[in-house]
Regions:
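Hinge/beta->alpha junction and helix N-cap segments in small-molecule ligand-binding domains
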Residues: 55-64, 82-91, 113-118, 142-144, ...
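Short acidic capping loops at alpha-helix termini that bridge into adjacent secondary structure
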Residues: 175-176, 207-211, 261-266
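Short acidic/polar active-site loop segments enriched in Thr and Asp
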Residues: 2, 48, 105, 174-176, ...
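Short helix-capping segments at alpha-helix termini
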Residues: 75-76, 133, 201-207, 232-235, ...
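Alpha-helical recognition/docking segments in bacterial nutrient-uptake
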Residues: 45-167
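N-terminal helix-turn-helix DNA-binding module of bacterial transcription factors
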Residues: 1-48, 324
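Flexible loop/turn connectors
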Residues: 151-154, 225-324
Length: 324
């Protein structure tokens, strides 16, 4: 029997007769032979890989996106690969080059949160390099690249979510509303800050720069920033937090200052992460469909859904006990 015939058997070629296929597979089993799936994938045969590349896997955000993407990738018979960059552009570039060499079916890039021309140029280069080997790049959890309409992206409505949160607080009687968690040159804070500003403008309220507070995106950094903010004589009566993790820090600060939630200060988070289940009073927050972002991202990347450019999924304001 020729090597060509054996290769056709392992590639599941329709020209091979059933009896021949059975003999080859039986011989392979006796010899303990294992098919080189990577080599098959690189030749466009067998199972291919869908790669999910994230900045990190801390918290539920990227984990939920990855789970959604994996559900689609595996249902379509693909292998699913997960890797992280640590928000290092050099690591990101090296990883994308390695993935290109392995000829994946698709790559989903999540959490590359930088903005600006330099990132868009990188994304275009990634997309072109992957397209040359038959793969598609999709940004997930990232807003549209205005200067590069050819870059596909699947995101969620961050601006609208925060805008609705501010409207909710204004309706509850609040006028001094702070935004806590600004991190420069990142898409997520930039989008959420824009929603905050638009919400104030909708209500005819000025944007007070002294109420836009930068802090680390964790409960410890938020607690320190909130202690200073809430100790002011003219302290805000409500805070919109960049994330639920930031909101946890604000809870700690308010309690240490003897402030009641929401009587003295109302608090709104963002994400509806699992950590909010432990907060008392229950946190008002903006629910994000992270799993669905991953699902749609994978479907677009694999050509199961066709979208022209950018897909944006809705967010939902979940009103609980920490706001009026």
């Amino acid at each position: 029997m020729s090597l060509t015939t054996a290769s056709r058997v392992f590639a599941d070629h329709p020209s091979v007769r059933p009896a021949t296929r059975d003999r080859v597979l039986a011989a392979a089993d006796d010899l303990g032979y294992v098919v080189n799936a990577l080599a098959q994938a690189m030749m466009g045969l067998g199972r291919r890989t869908v790669a999910f590349v994230a900045a990190h896997m801390i918290g539920s955000t990227f984990a939920d996106m990855a789970a959604g993407a994996e559900s689609v990738a595996t249902a379509e018979g693909n292998l699913f690969l997960l890797s992280t960059t640590g928000e290092d552009p050099a690591r990101e570039r090296d990883l994308m080059e390695t993935l290109r060499e392995y000829r994946p079916a698709a790559v989903l890039l999540a959490g590359s949160t930088q903005t600006g021309e330099e990132f868009e140029q990188r994304a275009v280069a990634y997309a072109e390099a992957l397209a040359a080997v038959g793969a598609r790049l999709v940004l997930v959890g990232h807003p549209a690249c205005p200067g590069s309409k050819s870059i596909l992206s699947v995101d969620y409505d961050q601006v609208g979510g925060v805008r609705r949160a501010v409207e909710h607080l204004v309706t509850g009687g609040h006028r001094r509303i702070a935004f806590l968690g600004l991190i420069p040159e990142r898409t997520t804070p930039a989008e959420r800050l824009r929603g905050y500003e638009l919400g104030l403008q909708d209500a005819g309220l000025p944007v007070d720069p002294s109420l836009v507070i930068e802090c680390a995106n964790d409960s410890d950094g938020a607690r320190v920033a909130a202690l200073s903010l809430l100790s002011r004589p003219d302290r805000p009566t409500a805070l919109v937090c960049l994330t639920d993790g930031v909101a946890v820090g604000v809870y700690r600060a308010a309690r240490s200052l003897g402030l009641a939630i929401p009587g003295d200060v109302a608090i709104v988070g963002f994400d509806d992460a699992p950590i909010v289940a432990d907060l008392t009073p229950a946190l008002t927050t903006i629910r994000v469909p992270f799993w669905e972002v991953g699902v749609h991202g994978a479907r677009v990347a694999l050509g199961l859904e066709e979208y022209d450019g950018h897909v944006q999924l809705p967010t939902e304001l979940i009103v609980r006990e920490s706001s009026p």
